[in-house]
């Protein structure tokens, strides 16, 4: 595969990017040699990883569509990554053509390719921002232009919080975003785990990128104070594996790769935040 014709401003083509590695695994072309080398090392070291990433992508789409079918018309997709198949706006606008989506990522490559996500109707925007600064993001003019925080929001944080170390309080960050929404909003979150991964594979993941896999109990903490939903018909409300959430046949969907990510969808309850 040849390199991109030009390196977008602010992009370091010599440093791997999780978004570009993910893009490569899903068949995209917005990646560089360093990303492909890392991806091939991971593919060899963790044979079920590609299955895991597709399972995670499937959860993202099912969660977004579920929210849209339950009345959510505005979405905040944090850690959105590069454009790929069935992007959030493409999925939810099949339910409501006027649904609005704001994509957020800290990789300049995402912003450079934002044109693929922007539509003539003006229902989508892409923001280059660090999720560790909720105040800056929640007050960004592009977010406020499309999202009315006085109305329910679908917050999607899939495959992103395991890149935030404990020292940055990832649980507090998620709580901050949800505290800015009104009751009736939803959180859809997935998070990498190594609980079902052999030690050698777990070490390979840590050697390749700065990543903090977490346990089921740790992932469940992201939903503290929210009303966790049942992941599929007949189940109790719980955090589960990405292949199972929303699956028509959970037993068939329970692949080894899907167990590399925990996930959940939860409803915001309680009182609305005070506005200045």
PLM feature spans:
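A short SAM/SAH-binding and catalytic strip from SAM-dependent methyltransferases
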Residues: 131-132, 141-171, 177
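Rossmann-like AdoMet
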Residues: 1-129, 133-146
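Conserved beta-strand signature within the Rossmann-like core of class I S-adenosyl-L-methionine
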Residues: 153-157, 180-192
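Short, glycine-/aromatic-enriched active-site segment of Class I SAM-dependent methyltransferases
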Residues: 194-208
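Conserved S-adenosyl-L-methionine
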Residues: 22, 227-247
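Core SAM-dependent methyltransferase catalytic element
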Residues: 240-276
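Class I S-adenosylmethionine-dependent transferase superfamily signal
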Residues: 177-178, 223
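Short alpha-helix
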Residues: 209-235
């Amino acid at each position: 595969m040849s390199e991109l014709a030009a390196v977008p401003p602010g992009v370091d083509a010599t440093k791997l990017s999780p978004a570009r590695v993910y893009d490569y695994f899903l068949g995209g072309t917005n990646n560089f040699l360093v990303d492909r080398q890392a991806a091939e090392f991971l593919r060899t070291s963790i044979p079920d990883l590609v299955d895991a990433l597709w399972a995670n992508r499937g959860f993202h789409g099912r969660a977004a569509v579920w929210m849209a079918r339950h009345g959510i018309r505005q979405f905040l997709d944090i850690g959105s990554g590069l454009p790929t198949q069935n992007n959030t706006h493409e999925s939810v606008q099949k339910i409501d053509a006027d649904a609005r989506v704001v994509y957020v990522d800290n990789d300049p490559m995402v912003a450079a390719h934002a044109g693929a996500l922007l539509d003539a109707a003006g229902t989508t925007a892409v923001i280059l921002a660090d999720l560790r600064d909720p105040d800056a993001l929640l007050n960004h003019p592009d977010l406020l232009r499309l999202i009315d925080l006085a109305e329910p929001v679908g917050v999607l944080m899939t495959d992103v919080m395991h890149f935030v170390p404990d020292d940055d309080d990832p649980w507090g960050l998620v709580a901050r975003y949800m505290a800015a929404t009104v009751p009736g909003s939803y959180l859809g979150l997935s998070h990498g785990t190594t609980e079902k991964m052999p030690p050698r594979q777990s070490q390979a993941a840590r050697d390749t990128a700065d990543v903090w896999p977490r346990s089921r109990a740790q992932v469940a903490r992201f939903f503290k104070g929210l009303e966790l939903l049942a992941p599929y018909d007949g189940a109790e409300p719980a955090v589960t594996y990405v292949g199972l959430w929303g699956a028509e046949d959970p037993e068939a969907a329970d692949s080894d790769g899907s167990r590399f990510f925990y996930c959940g969808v939860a409803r915001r309850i309680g009182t609305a935040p005070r506005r200045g």
